[in-house]
């Protein structure tokens, strides 16, 4: 299962009841953080998530409301006792930005690996840590270089006892091969994981899009997502001219992407400071896509793999 925690749902500047953009994804006890706006640490402390197990930090773009909380968080992660490397992914300029932000966190007990402006789908390995997740990115349309993220969490195929016995695979290797250790040599014989497993099973797809106009490429990128987290800077339809000018989206535009992308659920976030009660405008999204949820700080949901 995958736990998603919306640490902050605000855009622009923090408010008394709304921290800035940050989303925490927990899978198998390891964590991926998407954006790190002001208040991220506080929200994590309130939620009792811990800091040590954050392996990947994905930054959508280099605007303060999405990254200003990063140096403090890096220091806190260091104080938590972490020594394993952390990977930071972001758009063009992320390397220079992280280096400058580290002026106030210049010594850390772990390495930082930076992936700047990635283009292809990739998997991250970090020592013995394998999140078993494919990460894809998409260039968005904002006032600074901005990327969206898609996370595909793979599911282990079912173990096939009959197949394993037919292939004469030693029982001491069954568990290792099922857990995707591809090749094992024992007593001069080669054993592969397809000798003990059945067909692949569907994983879980989570897409996060924020700070952009609703460009067509988003539809294919988010297609068939189990969970689509999207910005909704403006709730009212009449604010469309502002959304166009500032390169953001209205609730209705986000819902239209969800509908065309055939996603299962839409979670709206990144609410502008002029919007005190986002729930008042939920109908503007529901008229287009009726599986829309209005996010709030520390909103939490769990996604389960289908039983098959």
Curated annotation (Swiss-Prot):
SUPFAM superfamilies the record matches: Metallo-hydrolase/oxidoreductase
InterPro entries: Metallo-B-lactamas, RibonucZ/Hydroxyglut_hydro, RNase_Z/BN
Keyword Hydrolase: yes
Gene Ontology MF terms: 3'-tRNA processing endoribonuclease activity; zinc ion binding
Active site annotation, chain numbering: 65
Superkingdom classification of source: Bacteria
Function: Zinc phosphodiesterase, which displays some tRNA 3'-processing endonuclease activity. Probably involved in tRNA maturation, by removing a 3'-trailer from precursor tRNA.
Record protein name field: Ribonuclease Z
Species the sequence originates in: Clostridium beijerinckii (strain ATCC 51743 / NCIMB 8052) (Clostridium acetobutylicum)
Gene encoding the protein: rnz
């Amino acid at each position: 299962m995958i736990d998603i925690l919306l640490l902050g749902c605000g855009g622009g500047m923090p408010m008394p009841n709304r921290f800035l953009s940050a989303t925490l994804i927990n899978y198998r006890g390891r964590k991926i953080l998407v954006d790190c706006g002001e208040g991220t640490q506080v929200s994590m402390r309130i939620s009792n998530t811990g800091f040590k197990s954050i392996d990947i930090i994905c930054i959508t773009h280099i605007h303060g409301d999405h990254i200003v909380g990063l140096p403090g968080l890096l220091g806190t992660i260091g104080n938590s006792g972490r020594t394993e490397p952390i990977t930071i992914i972001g758009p063009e300029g992320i390397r220079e930005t992280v280096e400058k932000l580290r002026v106030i966190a210049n010594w850390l007990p772990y390495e930082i690996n930076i992936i700047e402006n990635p283009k292809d789908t990739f998997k991250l390995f970090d020592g013995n840590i394998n999140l078993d997740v494919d990460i894809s990115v998409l260039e968005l349309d904002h006032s600074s270089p901005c990327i969206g993220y898609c996370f595909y969490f793979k599911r282990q195929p079912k173990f096939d006892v009959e197949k394993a016995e037919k292939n004469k695979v030693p029982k001491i290797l069954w568990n290792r091969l099922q857990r995707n250790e591809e090749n094992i040599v024992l007593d001069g014989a080669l054993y592969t994981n397809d000798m003990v497993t059945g067909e692949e099973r569907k994983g879980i797809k989570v897409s996060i899009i924020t700070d952009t106009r609703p460009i067509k490429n988003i539809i294919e990128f988010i297609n068939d997502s189990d969970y689509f987290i999207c910005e909704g800077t403006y709730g009212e339809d009449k604010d469309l001219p502002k959304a166009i000018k500032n390169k953001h989206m209205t609730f209705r535009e986000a819902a239209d992407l969800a509908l065309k992308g055939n996603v299962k659920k839409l979670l709206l976030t990144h609410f502008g400071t002029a919007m005190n009660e986002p729930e008042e405008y939920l109908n503007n999204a529901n008229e287009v896509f009726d599986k829309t949820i209005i996010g709030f700080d520390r909103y939490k949901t769990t996604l389960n793999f289908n039983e098959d």
